[in-house]
Amino acid sequence: MRSSLRTALAVTVVATVGIALSGCAGPGGSTGGGGDATSIEDALEEGGTLTYWAWAPSSEAQVAAFEKAYPNVDVKLVNAGSGVDAYTKLQNTIKAGKGAPDVAQLEDTAVPQFALSDSLVDLTAYGLDELEDQYTVGTWSAVASDGKLFGLPQDSGPMSLYYNKRVFDQHGIAVPTTWDEYVAAAKTLHEADPSTYLTSDNGDGLFASSLIWQAGGRPFQVDGTKVTIDLQDEGTLKWTSVWNELVENELLAPTAAYSDDWYKQLGSGQIASLISAAWLPSLLQTAAADGAGDWRAAPMPTYDGTPASANYGGSAQVVIKQSEQQALAAGFVEWLNNSPEGIQLLIDSGSFPSTTADIDSPASLDLATEYFGGQKINEVAQASGESVSEGWQYLPFQVYAQTIFPDTVGQSYANNTDLNEGLKDWQDALVKYGNEQGFEVVTK
């Protein structure tokens, strides 16, 4: 099983942003009554108060439904956000030994650093590891390793090509199945209408990592305290050979991603496609409503026409060791991500689930979306999830890595220059940072 945590779990502690590799987990909480499925049931019946840090759109509705099902439990929901600031705040409360939530939502990229710092409860104690077969391989391996389970997957992000059929038809562009065809389409479209771009990318570390993943790159390898970084491996160079064509020829829309103008251009067709994840459709429908009926979904282009994909985003719910209600917290996590009602509320909010039964269900696969011209777009996402390649690892300081991407590789985007030069700068900065945090970081 692929896992970003597999070999790294020989380390007992790890740096988070700005915190060196040292004992930083802080005092642990009690087990909340011992660990097994029975203790979860007993804890839910007895009740108590939980604090939950989350940002998912479904969180409020899920908490309300959970409290209705278990009236003796009071869940205090806090939208603490995500990203470096939120994770630094969480780590600081863990280190201080007080103030941490009982349950937190973590992006897949952040799970390793909290697992390695011994900050998370191993949910195998409550029998939740028995749920493995109910989740996709990629999402489960993001939270499980070496017989330990650090959370339950919630949403996932298998990647696809989302495109504006009206614009494609207007310019006689066939849906590209290879990256060479995608670059050719970008040139054709922009030459025909200089105000229109095939796609948008300002330089995002997570997005770039996902594209490298799909290309077969494995630039990050973790083995205990040893971290190997090779941002010039074969797969990474495959990606830059394609993306340099778009960057150096100024074929990427310069509009800032997720800005009002960006959504407006997606709605009008000035940005005619996006390589993105299964969570994109809900964003388009709400923020780029003018594109209704024009958009479609297709498999992600590949290098040789053979299906291949990657995950872009995804998150899980974890129980923080500081919690004094660990059994109750584990029960809440199980309800959120493994109960029919909890998962349905997630789906209703526009997120793509991690549970195979829900992904493969006729209700999901047969759902026709008017925004996408009546297409059953979940069929595309489901096939993408099945073609996610294994073997990918995130750095144990991945959150930090993404924060410095704009200052390194991002400069190549900004100046329309060779991405490989930016990747080398990124690698140098990561090696320096990792060694400062107590890892042995080497390059190939």
PLM regions: where:
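Conserved C-terminal helix/tail region of periplasmic/extracytoplasmic solute-binding proteins
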Residues: D169, S384-K444
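Extracytoplasmic/periplasmic solute-binding protein
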Residues: K148-Q154, M159, V183-T228, I271
